[in-house]
Each structure stands twice: as C-alpha cells, then as structure tokens.
C-alpha cells in the first residue's frame, strides 16, 4: 500500500542523458548489471562506515550482500542489497537529478559519433540510469538504515519525462531495483547468462553476490531453490598479485571509476614496516571530460583496515596527479578519520609522499619501457603534469624528466621531445636549453627569433600551451643547464655567437644616425632601438629585456583578469636586410615614418599575434603599396 504519491519531472539533463545513453551504449548493454552491483557495493560500504559510530544501523543484520533474482513469466530482473538505503529526499536527489557541475557542458559535447559518445558517457558515469538500456520500466523500493518500516520509498519510471515517488512499508533495510525488461532483452532472464556477466564484471568486489538458483537432487530432479554465492567476495586488493589476472585488474578499475575504458597501466603495492598500507593505483587511458573543472572530483578511495571511509580522498595525491585513480587501504589511520583530520596528519603526509613517489615511478617506467604508450598518456594528461614543477619542489627533477615538448628537431607539432633528449643533442659549447613560447605551434615554429638558431643548427623547444610560460618560471634549469628563452633582447649565445665582431662594429657605426632617427620618431613607445645580428630573413623584431615580463606571461595574466603594466619592447632592426637598408636612405620624413611604423607593426604582429589598431596598419600598408605600384 503506497501513500503520499506524487509525479515529478526529470531534470532536463537526465532526460537528455537517458536518450543519448540508450542510443550510445546499446552495443555494450550488459554493463547495466555491473553498474547496479557496483552501486549496491557502495551502499554496503557506506553502511559499514556509518555503523562504526552507530552500530544500531545494522538492525541485527550485519551480513551484507547483493542478491539477484529473475522472473521469466513477469519479465523482471531484481537486484537487491541490504546496504545504507535511501530516504525520500535522497531518492529524489539521486534518481531525479544529476548533481554534477558542468553537466550541461558535458551533454553539449555529445554529438552524432556513437563510439565517441559511448566513451564520454562512460567517463561521466551513468550508474543507476544504465538500467534503462535494457528496461522500459524501473521500480525501486528502498528504506534507509535507522528509519522505521513505514518510511520506505517507492520510485517508478519508464525513463521518459517523469517519475513517481510514494511512501510504502518495507521491512528489510536497503534497496531493491526491479527492471521490467524490454521484449528483446529477455535473454538476460537466464541463470547462466547472469552468472557469466557477474563473473566477468563483479568477481572482484568484496561483497557476496548471490543468485536465486534451483536445487537438484542426485537424479537431476528439481527439489527447490536457494541463494548461491557466485563471486569470490574477497576485496581484490587484499589478494596476492600473482593470483589476480589482467582482466580482473581492468574490471576492478571500471568498478572504481565507472569508466568504460580499460586503464593505461596500474600498480598494486603492499607496504609493511613503519607504515602498513596497500595501494592500487591506475592511470586512465582517457582524460575525463571535466579534468580542468575546478569542482572535478578526484582522489583515491580510502579504506582503513578494509573498512570503506570515503570516496575522492584528495589529500593523498597532489593536484598535478589528479588524473590518478585507485584506492588506499591503510592500517595506520583511525577508523573515525574525517576529511578535516586528514588535512593535518603526519600519517597522511607520509602516505601522500609515498603514493606521489609511486605514481611518478609508474610514469617513469612507462616512459622508459614504452615510448608510444607514454605518448598516448602525454596527449591526454601532459597539460596537467606541467603543473607539477610549480606544485612539487621535492619531485621537480623527476617531473622535469617526464615532460615532453615540440622542438625544431622534429617537423611535427607532437610533443615528444624530453629534456634529456635535448641535452643529449646539445652543440659543443652550448650552455643553455633554448625555447620559444607562442600562442600556437605554427607561430612558434615560424618566429623570426628562430632564424639564427636555424642557421646554426641549434635545437629550440617550441612551446605553445598556455601553461608553459608559467611552468618555466618554476622550472629554470635541468641537468645543471639553464632554460633560456630566445625572445629576450640581450640573448647571450656564449661560445656559439658569431665571431664577426669587426664587421658588426662597422655596421653599428654606419647605421648609428639611422638608429637615432628611429629612436626620435618612436620616443617612449619602445624601450630601446638597436641593430640586431641574429636575423637572416626578417627585417625587424621586438624583444623584451631580462628584467621584463615576456609577451606570453603578460597574456597569461591578462587572461586571468589581472591588470599588468604595459610591456615596452626593444625594437631590433636587421642591417643586412634590403628593406632596412632602403628605409635608412629615405630623406622624406613622412615616408620614413610610414615605413618605420610598418616595420614596427609587422614585428609586433609576429610577436603578439595581434595589433592594437589593425585598421591603421592595413591603411598604412595599402598606402605604401599604392605608392610602390604607381612608379
């Protein structure tokens, strides 16, 4: 008998997700059972945790389990647990809405590519809603631990626009989900089919999964039915590594993360001594859709003495390793540990240090043993790893070895060059690791600042990620060699510099009056005007001084909404270039001014990628071109 019934509309994002999910995940539909068993396992974990402080929540029934039964006549499959259960408000919150930040953005990323959509939805984690892949109606009966039998809740929906919720009586604690299977999904109402799926997806969870099975006598006659445990029901991380198959590790990752894709790699460690803990760390194959969302949930699943404590314990991994998934089972933390206690705890600090080191070792080994696989990792998570040098001084050298960059050594935008690779190829007499930053790879590759380096065959790292300039303010050297930008006005090439000092000195004297004339014209708009001998094909460049912020750093601050002082550039002119030589001979002041302005604007455009007044630049260009073509 149900009371207080109401019909409610799904949150719009739920409706959209249900439609997309049924379409995109149809080819992998058996995962619905994994998701529902995984939820039941989580419900048991949460009850165990709450019962640490309130044992009465067990209600005399501490034997936690998941039970599965089916009814061929009715076409139903039922998954039940005796875990924490839900109240009416929790049912509405969990089954009627998606309480994830960035959900709208995620849904807008889904399109017509079914394979890509399937992967994205898998990363998002559909959980309970996966039931609608195979069912045209879902019924949920649930009672929260510690509340009376008449405070249970009935939830029903056909997975379209709305659902109903009502109060019912339910003696047993926990949640019972009944799937009314579609006509073409009745193959799931089969004992051996269910055993196969559960063995494949849920053998690793620490909770018994039981199926209602028929009993037979010695002559093969049916004598009744009984509940039969069909999984190992031993937490995977407590087992010996040599007993665990690759497939079991992969399925456990999917249970932990609700990701549908196999992980890239994992490491399972049991540590004894000053600290006693077991860790199982995974590197996903794909970056989650919300990796750069500030509210992105990350961290390890925390157990203390095999008792679940919390999801997403962020304190055990630094932020630059937030892509790592897995669990930690510690013997040294108290069972009543809270997020607040974790923040300021010596044991936590020691565990974080050890787990960070282990995660970095995993990546070091991957980079050494399988460059192609490491490149796949870098394409997904390289941007996050670049946050490391600023966050983790103690491991800065290790992180630096893991970084990858594009370079003039390769004719490719792929970031595949390590700092160790670069150092091994350095020219004799080269003292620094040279780099250039720009908005894009193409802009970096074609920067006029590269001309002298290309001429001399000196490798330069080409950096175009927004984070690069910020990262390099923390990563200033590697292997005892400074990292040096080539866009500075006072670039010192040391032993690699040209030895033609006499001819350069003569040019400086020859063009001294020209340089003064340009200085007078531009005045305070530039920091300095000088000749340069590091260009081959370009008439002029602008550069910043050693005491100034670089162009890319200024852009970074501006993008963050911070007011920054104007960058005053040094204007460098190439006396070997025919255009500069011609302009130096112009006597008419207006014509001279127009050409100098054009050269400055060109240099600014090459450096910054934009101009404050592009219309004036175009007009000036057209005027000068018209004069040239009229002769």
Swiss-Prot record:
Nucleotide-binding is among the record's keywords: yes
Gene3D superfamilies: 3.30.230.80, 3.40.50.11260, Heat shock protein 90, C-terminal domain, Histidine kinase-like ATPase, C-terminal domain
Keyword Transport: no
GO terms for MF: ATP binding; ATP hydrolysis activity; ATP-dependent protein folding chaperone; unfolded protein binding
A cellular component annotation (GO) from this entry: cytoplasm
Main location: cytoplasm
Family annotation (InterPro entries): HATPase_C_sf, Heat_shock_protein_90_CS, HSP90_C, Hsp90_fam, Hsp90_N, Ribosomal_Su5_D2-typ_SF
SMART domains assigned: HATPase_c
CDD domains per the UniProt record, alphabetical: HATPase_Hsp90-like (cd16927)
Family: Belongs to the heat shock protein 90 family.
Protein name: Chaperone protein HtpG
Organism in which the protein naturally occurs: Pasteurella multocida (strain Pm70)
């Amino acid at each position: 008998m149900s009371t207080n019934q109401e019909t409610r509309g799904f949150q719009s994002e739920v409706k959209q997700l249900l439609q997309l999910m049924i379409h995109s995940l149809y080819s992998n539909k058996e995962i619905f059972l994994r998701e529902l068993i995984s939820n039941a396992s989580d419900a048991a974990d949460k009850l165990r945790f709450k019962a640490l402080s309130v044992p009465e929540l067990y209600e005399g029934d501490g034997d936690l389990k998941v039970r599965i039964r089916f009814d061929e006549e009715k076409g139903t499959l039922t998954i039940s647990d005796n875990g924490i259960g839900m109240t009416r408000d929790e049912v509405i919150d969990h089954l009627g809405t998606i309480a994830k930040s960035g959900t709208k953005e995620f849904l807008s990323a889904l399109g017509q590519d079914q394979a890509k959509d399937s992967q994205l939805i898998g990363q998002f984690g559909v959980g309970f809603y996966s039931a609608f892949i195979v069912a045209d109606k879902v019924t949920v009966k649930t009672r929260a631990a510690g509340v009376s039998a008449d405070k249970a809740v009935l939830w029903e929906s056909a997975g379209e626009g709305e659902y109903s919720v009502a109060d019912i009586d339910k003696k047993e604690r926990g949640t019972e989900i009944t799937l009314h299977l579609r006509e073409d999904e009745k193959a799931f109402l089969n004992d051996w089919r269910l055993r196969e799926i559960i063995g494949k997806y849920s053998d690793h969870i620490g909770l018994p999964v039981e199926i209602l099975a028929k009993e037979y006598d010695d002559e093969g006659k049916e004598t009744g039915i009984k509940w039969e445990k069909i999984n190992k029901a031993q937490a995977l991380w407590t087992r010996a590594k040599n007993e665990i198959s690759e497939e079991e590790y992969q399925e456990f990752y999917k249970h932990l993360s609700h990701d549908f894709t196999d992980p890239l790699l994992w490491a399972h460690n049991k540590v004894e001594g000053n600290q006693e803990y077991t860790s199982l760390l995974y590197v996903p194959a794909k970056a989650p859709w919300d990796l750069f969302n500030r509210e992105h949930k990350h961290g390890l699943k925390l157990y203390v003495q095999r008792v679940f404590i919390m999801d997403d314990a962020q304190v055990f991994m630094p932020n630059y390793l937030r892509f790592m998934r897995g669990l930690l089972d510690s013997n040294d933390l108290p069972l009543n540990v809270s997020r607040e206690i974790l923040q300021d705890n010596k044991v936590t600090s020691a565990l974080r240090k050890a787990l960070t080191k282990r995660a970095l070792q995993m990546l070091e080994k991957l980079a050494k043993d399988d460059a192609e696989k490491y490149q796949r990792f870098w394409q997904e998570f390289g941007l996050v790893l670049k946050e490391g040098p600023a966050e983790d001084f103690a491991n800065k050298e290790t992180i630096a070895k893991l970084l990858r960059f594009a370079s003039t050594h390769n004719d490719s935008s792929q970031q595949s060059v390590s700092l160790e690779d670069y150092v091994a190829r350095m020219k004799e007499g080269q003292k620094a690791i040279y780099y250039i930053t720009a908005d894009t790879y193409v802009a970096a590759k074609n920067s006029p600042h590269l001309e002298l380096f290309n001429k001399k065959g000196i490798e330069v790292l080409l950096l175009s990620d927004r984070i690069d300039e910020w990262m390099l303010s923390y990563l200033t050297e590697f292997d005892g060699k400074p990292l040096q930008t080539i866009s500075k006005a006072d670039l010192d090439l040391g032993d690699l510099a040209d030895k033609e000092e006499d001819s350069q000195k003569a040019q400086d004297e020859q063009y001294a009056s020209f340089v003064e004339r340009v200085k007078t014209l531009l005045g305070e708009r530039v920091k300095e005007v000088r000749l340069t001998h590091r260009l081959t094909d370009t008439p002029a460049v602008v550069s910043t001084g050693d005491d100034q912020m670089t162009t890319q750093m200024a852009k970074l601050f501006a993008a963050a909404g911070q007011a920054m002082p104007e960058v005053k550039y040094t204007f460098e002119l190439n006396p070997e270039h025919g255009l500069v030589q011609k302009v130096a001979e112009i006597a008419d002041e207006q014509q001279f001014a127009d050409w100098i302005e054009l050269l400055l604007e060109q240099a600014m455009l090459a450096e910054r990628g934009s101009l404050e007044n592009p219309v004036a630049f175009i007009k000036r260009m057209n005027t000068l071109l018209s004069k040239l073509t009229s002769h």
